[in-house]
Amino acid sequence: MSKEVIVESFELDHTIVKAPYVRLIGEETGPKGDIISNYDIRLVQPNEDSIPTAGLHTIEHLLAKLIRTRIDGMIDCSPFGCRTGFHMIMWGRHTSAKIAAVIKDSLKEIAETTTWEDVPGTTIESCGNYKDHSLFSAKEWAKLILEQGISDDAFERHVI
């Protein structure tokens, strides 16, 4: 007998969301009461645009470092296969507004001050696809996303 599985992201109506935004997808409570939260960090509008892999890859590496300097409890921040944003998994509860502020501040640093030397994990030893990076693309996309503003609501624009 197979277990019915519902994957929340496949149930989301991608035609009604308004990117860029941060959305709490859900929370799980572990056997000892620990809470893990899953966030949809949507940077571009689904089915209208996508971030090229080299730029998204560089944003991924930078966010892995930058988010951890701004908030405790990040477990992982991984890109969606559709290249419109990231899943971010966190210990504990945080408001979408708090996460949006962290993402905004991180993207601002990418856009304004990040140099190639700041990008972690860009060697053959530290990355499984080390040649597929573009700081130029990451910076340009960060600027575009910041110009649009990041909302803490996926369905109504409430820019933080």
UniProtKB/Swiss-Prot annotation:
Homodimer. GO terms for cellular component: cytosol. Pfam families: LuxS (PF02664). Its cofactor is Fe cation. It catalyses: S-(5-deoxy-D-ribos-5-yl)-L-homocysteine = (S)-4,5-dihydroxypentane-2,3-dione + L-homocysteine. Binds 1 Fe cation per subunit. NCBIfam families: PRK02260.2-5, PRK02260.3-1. Coiled coil: none annotated. One of its GO terms (biological process) is L-methionine salvage from S-adenosylmethionine. The gene is luxS. It comes from Streptococcus pneumoniae (strain ATCC BAA-255 / R6). Its EC number is 4.4.1.21. PANTHER family: S-RIBOSYLHOMOCYSTEINE LYASE. Belongs to the LuxS family. This is S-ribosylhomocysteine lyase. Signal peptide: none annotated. One of its GO terms (molecular function) is iron ion binding. InterPro entries: LuxS_sf (IPR037005), Metalloenz_LuxS/M16 (IPR011249), S-ribosylhomocysteinase (IPR003815). Fe cation binds at residues 57, 61, 127. The lineage of its organism: Bacteria, Bacillati, Bacillota, Bacilli, Lactobacillales. Involved in the synthesis of autoinducer 2 (AI-2) which is secreted by bacteria and is used to communicate both the cell density and the metabolic potential of the environment. The regulation of gene expression in response to changes in cell density is called quorum sensing. Catalyzes the transformation of S-ribosylhomocysteine (RHC) to homocysteine (HC) and 4,5-dihydroxy-2,3-pentadione (DPD). Keywords: Autoinducer synthesis, Iron, Lyase, Metal-binding, Quorum sensing.
